[in-house]
Amino acid sequence: LGINVGALIGHSAVRLYVMGEDSQKREATDDEIKQMVEIVEMAMKHGALGVSSSYVDVDENFDPVPSRFSCIKEKMALAKAATITGRGVWQVVPYFIDMETQLKNIQELGDISLETGIMCTFQPVLSTPDAPKAERIMEALQKERDRGAKVFGQTMPRCFDLNMRLSETSMLLFGMPTWKSIM
């Protein structure tokens, strides 16, 4: 039995490499997007499976990670670059803290898929199977597939459990408006 591993290109890592500290301050310029596209194309030619990005993650200082500062133009360009080998996936962590924002993330993934032809996935779909939240997510996914987009949610085959320490960064705590100022 072999190891089942595939490498994804980190959107935040590519932004940080190209833009330095500005990657967590602003949108990329056209030249910076071009540089990022070249990196993604090179990685895909060397065996990467696609790009990973995030709508929700924060760094050790509770600041949004670089990918959260990207505009749709950048996302489209990198997703398109990830398809040059005939394969490619755009994998994201949605902003699962807020349902309406998460639904907008799903629609944006649909737009990216339709524009570039890439398959988009997001994980986690956090909910119980009978919860209204899960139903809304499934409806949003179906709506995107009805438009012709390749957008799929992923989840675990078991209950989601979370071990947290107040001394460490937690995306869930970031969703609480006063948490950053307290820490």
Task: Locate predicted features.
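Polyanionic/metal-chelating signatures
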Residues: 1, 12-14, 22-31, 39, ...
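Active-site-proximal beta-strand/loop segments in catalytic clefts of secreted hydrolases
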Residues: 54, 93-95, 123-125
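Phosphate/oxyanion-binding active-site loops and adjacent basic polyanion-contact surfaces
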Residues: 71, 101-102
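Catalytic pocket of metal/acid-base enzymes, prominently hydrolases
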Residues: 1-92
